[in-house]
Amino acid sequence: NLFQFAEMIVKMTGKNPLSSYSDYGCYCGWGGKGKPQDATDRCCFVHDCCYEKVKSCKPKLSLYSYSFQNGGIVCGDNHSCKRAVCECDRVAATCFRDNLNTYDKKYHNYPPSQCTGTEQC
């Protein structure tokens, strides 16, 4: 769920998920349109696409089990829905960590009017 995703983000990046990722670029936060603006925004785009694939599992609410091991995240559920949602969140949190070097504050509160073009999942 979103609280577990937030915990993953903190653990993987050291950043506050609300201030750092809730309104970044064209896809980090609610909704999304246009082309992702950088690698971090693309992490959010891929996460949105992943949630779309598992929407019947109610990904924003679904509780799953996971742990942090050797600097990474391990999803623990055998339940297919819970595991799928966990994997969406794990991949995104890891993507944020892997792209910290290109994270750019100019994309905070990015105006939606600048989000043009189209991108397919």
From Swiss-Prot:
Known EC number: 3.1.1.4
Q: Which InterPro entries match?
A: PLipase_A2 (IPR001211), PLipase_A2_Asp_AS (IPR033112), PLipase_A2_dom (IPR016090), PLipase_A2_dom_sf (IPR036444), PLipase_A2_His_AS (IPR033113)
Keywords from the UniProt entry: Blood coagulation cascade inhibiting toxin, Calcium, Disulfide bond, Hemostasis impairing toxin, Hydrolase, Lipid degradation, Lipid metabolism, Metal-binding, Secreted, Toxin
Catalyzed reactions: a 1,2-diacyl-sn-glycero-3-phosphocholine + H2O = a 1-acyl-sn-glycero-3-phosphocholine + a fatty acid + H(+)
Disulfide pairs?
26-115, 28-44, 43-95, 49-121, 50-88, 57-81, 75-86
SMART domains of this UniProt entry?
PA2c
- Tell me which Pfam families the record gives: Phospholip_A2_1
Please give the SUPFAM superfamilies that the UniProt record associates with this protein.
Phospholipase A2, PLA2
- The question of whether Hydrolase is a record keyword is answered with yes
Q: What does this protein do?
A: Snake venom phospholipase A2 (PLA2) that has low enzymatic activity, is devoid of lethal activity but has strong anticoagulant activity. PLA2 catalyzes the calcium-dependent hydrolysis of the 2-acyl groups in 3-sn-phosphoglycerides.
Per the record, the similarity remark reads: Belongs to the phospholipase A2 family. Group II subfamily. D49 sub-subfamily.
Its quaternary organisation is:
Monomer.
What is this protein called in UniProt?
Basic phospholipase A2 RVV-VD
Q: Which organism is it from?
A: Daboia russelii (Russel's viper)
Q: What is the lineage of its organism?
A: Eukaryota, Metazoa, Chordata, Craniata, Vertebrata
